[in-house]
């Protein structure tokens, strides 16, 4: 009989080893859709699932004390956000993003049965100073204008 390790590939975590992701800090988060499919936009506008992704992101500070969404954008096939943890809280960033993805997926399955919304995990960057924060804030602000040059761009929506 095969072990779990022999059956499934061992994936390297994209998180910084031994870093506490519940630490007071700002984080640049990118969450991509499954196979980078453009599921959040129809004809260049947020569709019902895109609105769910947006509204659920805005709910994070209401559900998790100490969390703040400083800047975000829902793009056709990914979400960018600056998430700040203001106070030491029990829930780390991975838990909160996991819950966000779960809620959006659940509604996505109701709207579009059989749709796999998200790719596994998410990308994060610990923002270590104001200069990086400002650069990332501007990147998110300008992301919709630069969609065709974006590394996540596959085709027009």
Residue ranges and their predicted role:
Residues 1-157:
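Short catalytic/metal-binding and nucleic-acid-binding patches
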């Amino acid at each position: 009989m095969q072990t779990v390790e022999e059956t499934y590939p061992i994936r390297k975590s994209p998180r910084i080893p031994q870093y506490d992701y519940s630490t007071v800090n700002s984080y640049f988060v990118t969450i991509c859709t499954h196979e980078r499919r453009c599921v959040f936009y129809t004809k260049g506008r947020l569709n019902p699932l895109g609105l769910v992704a947006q509204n659920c992101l805005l709910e994070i500070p209401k559900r998790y004390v100490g969390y703040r969404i400083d800047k975000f954008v829902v793009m056709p096939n990914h979400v960018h956000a600056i998430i700040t943890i203001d106070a030491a809280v029990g829930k780390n960033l991975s838990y909160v993003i996991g819950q966000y993805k779960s809620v959006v997926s659940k509604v996505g399955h109701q709207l579009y049965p059989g749709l796999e919304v998200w790719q596994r995990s998410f990308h994060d960057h610990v923002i270590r100073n104001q200069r990086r924060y400002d650069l990332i804030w501007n990147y998110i602000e300008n992301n919709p204008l630069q969609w065709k040059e974006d590394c996540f761009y596959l085709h027009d929506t």
